[in-house]
């Protein structure tokens, strides 16, 4: 934390006994890849910043809520943060451990030292003072909560789209006697060896967990509620994502989608034959509209075709020893894994007029201006909410940090002019 002044009252409307720390630079909420990218770019511009993080270290999602076999689903060239490339000895698709080493090295390189175990409980704009007021609660080793208020002209929301787990409300879920967990708690299929496991969800995580379960001697069943696009991770020896990005420079998105689906059918065959219906919209069009990514196959598809991974319909209800599906069939299971994703927690703490975020914590549509993809009113910025992954987060971080640094430099120049009078 740089360039701060400590005050007593603060005028923030919170606990009068809590300190208020007035910051010269922005306050960044979140020390994941997005927050680190903003901080690093501000460092490059010579501007101060303060990062607050609710967990005990950087990249909490990657450290504590991912499975062991996870790799980046896109080639490393599309996942680099600003200013630093991946080491040349890293594989094309880095493991989660590779990526964590990269992130920790990145933080050290730019001397980013987040204030850890600070959970933001409220952030609001103080119009009379022209400052963002951010209240955090810190739990120390003695389990005593410490409330602190920070004040800054700029607030960067970098807490991400994956802050809270999503578990669907399914009738009878509490009655299921077997183990039930969210995918954030899954590490390896070893503990499920010999068990019948229902995986609810057919995204990239659900598919890869089914693959992992198979490889560890479990019997996975994947519950599919809606259509899903499965694409080979590579086409013609190159990354499917990379090919799509190149084609989009010259062709409309619908035409690129047709090409991807044609090649996917040639490589994978007819996915609907095995219970995976394709949506009416193409994979890139869906990604553009909803942010939902297609599945990039890393081996699960061949096990679906061979019957080692079985596709089942949407779950209607749970019983003590299994599940009933919407087609009326019932099956017994030893465990259930909800690979049902995450959501933003921004609405629980950010108080704004809805100009930047929806009530669900998603980034509001930018309309005709791309500016609103990363900047809101009164010095409010967001990074990592555009649904474009690490590549998009890096681009947003560059723009947000450059904008903040320019405004900070203006305030410094104005202060220097006043002091020289």
Swiss-Prot record:
InterPro entries attached to this UniProt entry? Auxin_biosynth/cation_transpt, FAD/NAD-bd_sf, Flavin_mOase-like
**Tissues where this protein is expressed:** Expressed in leaves, young panicles and young kernels. Highly expressed in embryos. Expressed in roots, shoots and panicles. Expressed in root tips, leaves, stems, young stem nodes and developing grains.
UniProt: FAD binding residues = 30-35
**Phenotypic consequence of gene deletion:** Narrow and rolled leaf phenotype. Reduced root growth. Tolerance to salt stress. Reduced response to inhibition of root elongation by ethylene.
Q: Which reaction does it catalyse?
A: indole-3-pyruvate + NADPH + O2 + H(+) = (indol-3-yl)acetate + CO2 + NADP(+) + H2O
Please verify whether the record's keywords include Endoplasmic reticulum: yes
Q: Which cofactor does it need?
A: FAD
Induction context: Induced by ethylene.
**Annotated Gene Ontology cellular component terms:** endoplasmic reticulum
Q: What GO MF annotations does this protein's record show? A: flavin adenine dinucleotide binding; indole-3-pyruvate monooxygenase activity; monooxygenase activity; N,N-dimethylaniline monooxygenase activity; NADP binding
Q: Where in the cell is it found?
A: Endoplasmic reticulum
Question: What Enzyme Commission number(s) apply to this enzyme?
Answer: 1.14.13.168
Task: Provide the alphabetized UniProt keywords.
Answer: Auxin biosynthesis, Endoplasmic reticulum, FAD, Flavoprotein, Monooxygenase, NADP, Oxidoreductase
Which GO biological-process labels does this protein carry?
auxin biosynthetic process; regulation of leaf development; regulation of root development
Taxonomically, the superkingdom here is: Eukaryota
**Per UniProt, where does NADP(+) bind?**
201-206
Entry function: Involved in auxin biosynthesis. Converts the indole-3-pyruvic acid (IPA) produced by the TAA family to indole-3-acetic acid (IAA). Seems not able to use tryptamine (TAM) as substrate. Probably responsible for auxin biosynthesis in leaves and involved in the regulation of lateral leaf growth. Required for maintaining water homeostasis and an appropriate root to shoot ratio. Required for the inhibition of root growth by ethylene in etiolated seedlings. Functions downstream of the ethylene-response transcription factor EIL1.
Question: Any miscellaneous information on file?
Answer: Calli overexpressing YUCCA8 exhibit high levels of auxin, low regeneration frequency, overgrowing roots and abnormal root morphology.
The record's family statement is: Belongs to the FMO family.
By what name is this protein known?
Answer: Indole-3-pyruvate monooxygenase YUCCA8
Query: To which species is this protein native?
Result: Oryza sativa subsp. japonica (Rice)
Kindly list the organism's lineage: Eukaryota, Viridiplantae, Streptophyta, Embryophyta, Tracheophyta
């Amino acid at each position: 934390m740089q360039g701060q002044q400590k005050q007593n009252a603060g005028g923030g409307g919170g606990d009068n006994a809590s300190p208020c720390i007035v910051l010269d630079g922005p306050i960044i909420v979140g020390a994941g890849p997005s927050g680190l990218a903003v901080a690093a770019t501000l460092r490059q511009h010579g501007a101060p910043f303060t990062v607050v993080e609710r967990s005990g270290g950087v990249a909490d999602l990657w450290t504590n809520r991912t499975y062991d076999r996870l790799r980046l689903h896109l080639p490393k060239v599309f996942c680099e943060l600003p200013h630093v490339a991946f080491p040349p000895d890293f594989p094309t698709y880095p493991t989660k451990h590779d990526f964590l080493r990269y992130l920790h090295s990145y933080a050290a390189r730019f001397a980013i030292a987040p204030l850890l175990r600070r959970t933001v409980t409220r952030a609001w704009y103080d119009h009379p003072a022209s400052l963002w007021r951010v209240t955090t609660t810190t739990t120390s080793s003695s389990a005593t909560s410490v409330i602190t208020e920070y004040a800054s002209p700029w607030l960067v929301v970098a807490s991400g789209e994956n802050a809270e787990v999503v578990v669907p409300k399914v009738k009878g879920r509490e009655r299921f006697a077997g183990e039930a967990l969210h995918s954030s708690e899954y590490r390896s299929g070893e503990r499920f060896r010999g068990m019948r496991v229902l995986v609810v969800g057919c995204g990239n995580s659900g598919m890869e967990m089914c693959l992992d379960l198979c490889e560890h001697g479990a019997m996975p069943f994947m519950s599919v509620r809606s259509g899903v696009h499965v694409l080979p991770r590579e086409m013609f020896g190159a990354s499917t994502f990379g090919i799509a990005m190149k084609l989009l420079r010259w062709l409309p998105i619908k035409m690129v989608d047709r090409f991807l689906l044609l090649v996917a059918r040639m490589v994978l065959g007819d996915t609907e034959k095995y219970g995976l219906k394709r949506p009416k919209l193409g994979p890139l069009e869906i990604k553009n509209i909803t942010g939902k990514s297609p599945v990039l196959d890393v081996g699960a598809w061949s096990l679906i075709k061979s019957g080692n991974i079985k596709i089942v319909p949407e779950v209607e209800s749970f019983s003590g020893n299994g599940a009933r599906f919407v087609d009326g069939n019932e099956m017994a299971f030893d465990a259930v894994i909800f690979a049902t994703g995450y959501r933003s927690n921004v609405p629980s703490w950010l108080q704004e007029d809805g100009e930047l975020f929806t009530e669900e914590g998603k980034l509001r549509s930018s309309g005709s201006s791309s500016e609103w993809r990363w900047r809101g009113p009164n010095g409010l910025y967001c990074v990592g909410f555009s649904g474009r992954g690490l590549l998009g987060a890096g681009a947003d971080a560059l723009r947000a940090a450059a904008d903040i640094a320019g405004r900070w430099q203006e305030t410094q120049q104005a202060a220097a002019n006043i002091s020289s009078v």
